Amino acid sequence: MGKEKIHINIVVIGHVDSGKSTTTGHLIYKCGGIDKRTIEKFEKEAQEMGKGSFKYAWVLDKLKAERERGITIDIALWKFETAKYYVTIIDAPGHRDFIKNMITGTSQADCAVLIVAAGVGEFEAGISKNGQTREHALLAYTLGVKQLIVGVNKMDSTEPPFSEARFEEIKKEVSAYIKKIGYNPAAVAFVPISGWHGDNMLEASDRLPWYKGWNIERKEGKADGKTLLDALDAILPPSRPTEKPLRLPLQDVYKIGGIGTVPVGRVETGIIKPGMIVTFAPANITTEVKSVEMHHESLEQASPGDNVGFNVKNVSVKELRRGYVASDSKNNPARGSQDFFAQVIVLNHPGQISNGYTPVLDCHTAHIACKFAEIKEKCDRRTGKTTEAEPKFIKSGDAAMITLVPSKPLCVEAFSDFPPLGRFAVRDMRQTVAVGVIKSVNFKDPTAGKVTKAAEKAGKKK
């Protein structure tokens, strides 16, 4: 085997009926982790259920159903390969918690693939004021997904089919729209596709003779190609933040017989390795890491993106919980926050939000009520310029700079320092009513916390 391919994450966005599932299913089906046996099983079931047309969306429906039932499905099913990358689809919308997942997401997407439907009237519905196309694209940009690919889907159902004029019309309109959000259209590949029939998905289609391919320009250089797969291959690989101080939000804490306390989570920045003295914020508990495991194999060191379990000494399961953050006690350790200042974008709140509003915030793995202590200013979502100082209230569509105060100890960071710990979803009435990006944090002075014997011993050894 040659050198392993780089792993990248994409998120697929777009309006409900744009054909996201079919397109995604097609990629997974053709280049992906679904083995022949599973596909045959799905096809057989599809025929029995009279879904003979089957195609690709069904693959995705099956996977989604399993994911939502909480069956830990083989994540390989959500992966596929390009010439350069292993691609993981981290979430496909349509899932009720999509927005929340995208924010607290187990991972940051490196690129968003926006699917728009070219069918008569369909594109217009998706991009209309209340269509989801706009909201998803804005969210992706706000949350730091700076690369975008646009798939103009259902080219087979334009009038006439595979119409160049329709493709150009959509390209022009979407370009204007994404430019408003902050994307540079010159760096975005627009690919006319049919996710159902497969035109321009993996191979150039002869049914669009007018289409000469896409080409993009960005400061890292130019790229061009014909298909959606080519465009995915042209994604700029992410730099994984290994050099930064460790931040590892805990997803769970287990007590394992014969081993002891094992916190589990994903390394967001930095590295973790046996022998390291870690501090858990906001509780300020410091102890030594005895071992680090991933998929039941012990590691010398874990890096950003790795989901790991690590064994800590002299700390009981009761002292740690989901939402705490592990960090290196000797390198800019994490601390609890007194309050923090954030840009908040209200997505869908039926009323008015004023000072004192206290919804639940989902930030990395933490889930804690926070008070909107002071709405300092309303601002333009795109430029960040102030439009009104100290507004009495804000409502859907507004962006504002707000000071938030957590009701219980909480560990967050500025988005510019640690992106995964600096973005949050505001949940109320069982839905995501707003999203936020943290600009600055007012940290608590750590009160004397618990330092375990193991940490003291290890500290002396150094």
Swiss-Prot record:
It is found in: Cytoplasm. The modification N6,N6,N6-trimethyllysine is found at K36, K79, K219, K318. The N-terminus is blocked. Keywords: Cytoplasm, Elongation factor, GTP-binding, Methylation, Nucleotide-binding, Phosphoprotein, Protein biosynthesis. It comes from the Eukaryota. Pfam families: GTP-eEF1A_C, GTP_EFTU, GTP_EFTU_D2. Gene3D superfamilies: P-loop containing nucleotide triphosphate hydrolases, Translation factors. Residues 153-156 are annotated as: G4. Belongs to the TRAFAC class translation factor GTPase superfamily. Classic translation factor GTPase family. EF-Tu/EF-1A subfamily. This is Elongation factor 1-alpha. It comes from Artemia salina.
